[in-house]
Amino acid sequence: VNVTTQSDGSGYLTFASGGTMKFSKAVTVTATAYTAGYDGVGTRTATGTTVHKGVAAVDKRVFPLGSDLYVVAKGMEYGLTRAEDTGMKGPKIDLYMESYQECIQFGRRTGTVYLLED
């Protein structure tokens, strides 16, 4: 993904396919991963949805619940996700993965989260 940033912090993501997405802000975060059924994690999010790939836990003061996000973490693009769960404090994001092994492999990474506009 190529990123074009305006002076106000907003900008566009441009993909190899030629498609674009507009974002209102980019936030540098610490990214981690979680999965259901491990360490007491259930299958329901704070917004009442069922966890699945594309769900993220956030600090709702940083990313409002229901926000569409695009996540790029060091060494990988997680891609589109939605802020549907809580439990993080500050500029952090916890990305849902399908397995514990994926979570271990992901570890803790520095990344950028783009808050997408409608």
Where are each of the predicted segments found?
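Solvent-exposed, well-ordered loop and adjacent helix/strand elements within mature globular domains
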Residues: 1-118
